[in-house]
Amino acid sequence: MTKFLFTSAIVLLLGCQSFQKTPDISAIDVPLTTIRFEQAFFAIDTLQLDPSLQKLAGQEHFFTQDFLYNILATTPQTAAKDVPQFMRAYQSMYKQVSTQFASLKTEEAAIKEGLQYVKYYFPDYKLPTKLITFIGPINSFGNIITIDALAVGLQMYLGKNDPIYLTEEGQNLYPVYVSRRFERAYMATNCMKNIIDDLYPLQDAGAPLCEQMVEAGKRLYFLKKVLPHEADSIVTGYTAAQLEGCYKSEKDIWSFFVQNNLLYEKDPSLIGDYMHDGPNTAVFGDSSPGFIGQFVGYRIVEAFLEKNKETSLDKLLKIPAKIIFEQAKYKP
């Protein structure tokens, strides 16, 4: 059974990738206004709830509706009870967020740079013009793309060791392999994931494993192109050690899929472990990452691009995964 191995040589290999030439985006203007919705929301007068919510909606109509009815999951009939109840329950978190996220300059800069690269590669795409921060229920949405905004739930970025994630309820919702990524360093990556989902909604349900892996690889390639300065461990979601292990064991990982006739398998019960997040991929050992199909798919995409160097990012995302897989002739 394959086990992951680690060598310092992999660190050097990954480090070299950051020196790839990136396009000059300095002249690309991307308007992005940050709106601290949580500040306006927690300032409302619950004794005058209806006019306060109407005023809030006047300031940010579309997101106020999204927040109340999708994130808080309240209704016009129950808002008078639900909103004050939520505000009381999350008042201490709001105070924490006010201190912890007093400034978002680093995150704003990374997100804006990502949008500049998106505009470079996809000039006709209508970019979000707002970055909206909010505090929502811990069991609700953390990252959203709306009609004109990227919305970020700061309750999902308090830091991996925040007590709220380590409670029994928190771990039931978000096991450690998930909550370890609840760091502000992941904010730009999560925003760009929403962009790719908007540009090219994933439609690989029922596809064989090889095609699902390629689709995941295409999306990871997109992230690396629009976030060229982010660490590989951030954009992949793997730990640095897991990523090292993937490169070191790349040949063994591929051999496993080939020898077990899994590449054209469609049964979710047989291939789900390779395409879903998890603490690890059991067959490869405790040191391996979950969602290991993303890594394999990314390497297949790289093999394809080695043979098709003039392929634009837009064109790559439009090419059927089946064609990429067949033409890549990937063999580590």
Which residue ranges define each predicted feature?
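Sec-exported extracytoplasmic/periplasmic mature domains
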Residues: F42, K119-P123, L223-A231, V258-L262, ...
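C-terminal soluble interaction/assembly domains
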Residues: Y264-P332
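N-terminal mature-domain "stem" immediately C-terminal to a signal peptide or N-terminal signal-anchor/transmembrane
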Residues: Q17-A89
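C-terminal motif of bacterial Sec signal peptides marking the signal peptidase cleavage site
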Residues: L13-G15
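Positively charged n-region of N-terminal signal peptides that target proteins for export
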Residues: M1-F4
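Acidic/His/Gly-enriched intrinsically disordered linker/tail segments
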Residues: G217-T281
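Acidic/His-rich structured neighborhood in mature extracellular/periplasmic domains
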Residues: V83-L243, A321
